[in-house]
């Protein structure tokens, strides 16, 4: 191991550390960071070299953050990145600094929104918040209105998590939806992601995603928002149901096939009488 450490450059060490951090399971960033910190044994190198990994992790995970003085949480996503470590809260029309390591928001300041699309964004946000409140008890959503390639586009992001470290599991739901405001009909594109880590008596991760495409009738802001939420609700319900059914089937069939119910001898071992067995005597003599 010592020879391997001598062969690795600082750049290679940081690259490996960054990969560990980016792939940290939901709710376990601090644990992975602390482990990597011990392995690297160079705080300055870690902070400077792996800073991009801290940021990438928060962007990928849709990390929610509370801004002092404001009621609702906002998600850290690539769509809200306005540069120089600042992010947008479109609901409150502010931008703020975000510390990717401490996961803290500071210095909120007014920020001009895309006024031409704000009424559409607000309508979708109102409808989406009601949907998230009903379906995700711990859910957070952020809705952006942006011009992309000259087209007015709505981007809706949802995050919900359950961190149960005492019970040895953590999980996170993420979904991202986009549609462009065009006459008559718009294409809706979505991606749904589930990540769960269970680590009691083993180490198992569920990582799943699904791409969605649908069409949306565009009329006025309020009606379009209602139709959009119907698409979101149907797709997310179907995905979650399919995941549950799939893993129930695997539990009933696939997992059971991975092990014998009895040893090859077709006889269970009585561990209280292990010393009377030949293997017990061999262990005693060892």
From Swiss-Prot:
Belongs to the F-actin-capping protein alpha subunit family. GO terms for biological process: actin cytoskeleton organization; barbed-end actin filament capping. This is F-actin-capping protein subunit alpha-2. GO terms for molecular function: actin filament binding. F-actin-capping proteins bind in a Ca(2+)-independent manner to the fast growing ends of actin filaments (barbed end) thereby blocking the exchange of subunits at these ends. Unlike other capping proteins (such as gelsolin and severin), these proteins do not sever actin filaments. Component of the F-actin capping complex, composed of a heterodimer of an alpha and a beta subunit. Component of the WASH complex, composed of F-actin-capping protein subunit alpha (CAPZA1, CAPZA2 or CAPZA3), F-actin-capping protein subunit beta (CAPZB), WASHC1, WASHC2, WASHC3, WASHC4 and WASHC5. Interacts with RCSD1/CAPZIP. The keyword Phosphoprotein applies. Keywords: Acetylation, Actin capping, Actin-binding, Phosphoprotein. The modification Phosphoserine is found at residue 9. The modification N-acetylalanine is found at residue 2. It comes from the Eukaryota. The gene is CAPZA2. One of its GO terms (cellular component) is F-actin capping protein complex. InterPro entries: CapZ_alpha, CapZ_alpha/beta, CapZ_alpha/beta_2, CapZ_alpha_1, F-actin_cap_asu_CS. Pfam families: F-actin_cap_A (PF01267).
């Amino acid at each position: 191991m010592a020879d391997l450490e001598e062969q690795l450059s600082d750049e290679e060490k940081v690259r490996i550390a960054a990969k560990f951090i980016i792939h940290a399971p939901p709710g376990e960033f601090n644990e992975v960071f602390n482990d990597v910190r011990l392995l690297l044994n160079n705080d300055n190198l870690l902070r400077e070299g792996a800073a991009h990994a801290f940021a990438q992790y928060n962007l990928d995970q849709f990390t929610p953050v509370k801004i002092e003085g404001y009621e609702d949480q906002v998600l850290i996503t690539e769509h809200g990145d306005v540069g120089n470590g600042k992010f947008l809260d479109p609901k409150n029309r502010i931008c703020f600094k975000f510390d990717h390591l401490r996961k803290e928001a500071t210095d909120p300041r007014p920020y001009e929104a895309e006024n031409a699309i704000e009424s559409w964004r607000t309508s979708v946000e109102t409808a989406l918040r009601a949907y998230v409140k009903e379906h995700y008890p711990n859910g957070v959503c952020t809705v952006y209105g942006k011009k992309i390639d000259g087209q007015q586009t709505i981007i809706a992001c949802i995050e919900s998590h359950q961190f149960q470290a005492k019970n040895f599991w953590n999980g996170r739901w993420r979904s991202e939806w986009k549609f462009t405001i065009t006459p008559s009909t718009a294409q809706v594109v979505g991606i749904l992601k589930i990540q769960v880590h269970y680590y009691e008596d083993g180490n198992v991760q569920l990582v799943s995603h699904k791409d969605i495409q649908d069409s949306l009738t565009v009329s006025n802001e309020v009606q379009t928002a209602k139709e959009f939420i119907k698409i979101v609700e149907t797709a997310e319900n179907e995905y979650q149901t399919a995941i549950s059914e799939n893993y129930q089937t695997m539990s009933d069939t696939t997992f059971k096939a991975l092990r014998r119910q009895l040893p090859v001898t077709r006889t269970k071992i009585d561990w209280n009488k292990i010393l009377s067995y030949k293997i017990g005597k061999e262990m005693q003599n060892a």
